Amino acid sequence: MEEYLNPINIFSEIGRLKKVLLHRPGEELENLTPFIMKNFLFDDIPYLEVARQEHEVFASILKNNLVEIEYIEDLVSEVLVSSVALQNKFISQFILEAEIKTDFTINLLKDYFSSLTIDNMISKMISGVVTEELKNYTSSLDDLVNGANLFIIDPMPNVLFTRDPFASIGNGVTINKMFTKVRQRETIFAEYIFKYHPVYKENVPIWLNRWEEASLEGGDELVLNKGLLVIGISERTEAKSVEKLAISLFKNKTSFDTILAFQIPKNRSYMHLDTVFTQIDYSVFTSFTSDDMYFSIYVLTYNPSSSKIHIKKEKARIKDVLSFYLGRKIDIIKCAGGDLIHGAREQWNDGANVLAIAPGEIIAYSRNHVTNKLFEENGIKVHRIPSSELSRGRGGPRCMSMPLIREDI
């Protein structure tokens, strides 16, 4: 891969993808049960063996298109292997954030994690720790009163969706305050990567950090060009965080001078903006429309002389707003062409959540055959991946990937 001056270089949604972050599906999926899956934001239980096969097809398409893949577990391992003191700090922080409250259990977990190889320790932190795995473990009164029984540390099945815990914007990142409690521990990995990894430490500005008051998730963060962002206000991202991100980007004198905030319904089906809206070519977007799907659009700009943000509400249609701020006519391909039945089915299965690997070239779930055919009829090259198991977590190819480097366009 050609060298870039910065380890993060994302100034578009569609520039040729050069480097991306993924997570291989692991034993955390095997620890989902019918009784807890809803709490962990899954609508069904994936079959791990097939999920891995499907994910490998995804990774193979990326590799065949000369995309360098980083795996989040490998980056964390590269951080921790450098220092025993850092390993101990990471273990202690992880246990603290898992809300383990008794000294006895804390010490058992420290001993347990320290006894594993670094790679196995990271895998176990993601997959969760059950009571039988800790020798001499006994439930405390606090455990019994608060219903702790099966897991001492809960699994993190949503690590599969690397898009959300942090997001690349320009040459920096947001390390996000996740909306749901079950996902908040995921961002500890990003914290350590950007603080301690030799490639990323001191080289990547942090626009927002994981301890912010308001939530922000990467599925709501879209980079359209060097001056323009689109941020979703959704079920998972709050308006406060959008404004705070704008302040950070503007005051740090980045190239971004305009943010379009798209407010969408707070609905499980539309949890992030990228579940209903993504860019797939220079002037082509895909979107989902239904009776309850609407976009309220706000524009945030900065006045350097007064150091104030100006916010206004746009009254024009989304197509006209995008055309104005991009300076060219744009087209929107609707999920299944707007068909009420196929459109709803295919949006639910991430028909709009596609990953652009180059202008006019995307990776999509094969099951969304009506939408995929429309893409191809409109000149878009579609790489299809199987998704009978991956789709059970309500995330598509864009959700399962965090671009680190794209070619500028």
Curated annotation (Swiss-Prot):
The active site is at C399. It is an enzyme of class 3 (hydrolase). InterPro entries: Arg_deiminase. It comes from the Bacteria. Keywords: Arginine metabolism, Cytoplasm, Hydrolase. Signal peptide: none annotated. Pathway: Amino-acid degradation; L-arginine degradation via ADI pathway; carbamoyl phosphate from L-arginine: step 1/2. It holds the Pfam family ADI. The keyword Cytoplasm applies. GO terms for biological process: arginine catabolic process to ornithine; arginine deiminase pathway. It is found in: Cytoplasm. GO terms for molecular function: arginine deiminase activity. Its EC number is 3.5.3.6. It catalyses: L-arginine + H2O = L-citrulline + NH4(+). HAMAP family: Arg_deiminase. NCBIfam families: arcA, PRK01388.1. This is Arginine deiminase. It comes from Borreliella afzelii (strain PKo). The gene is arcA.
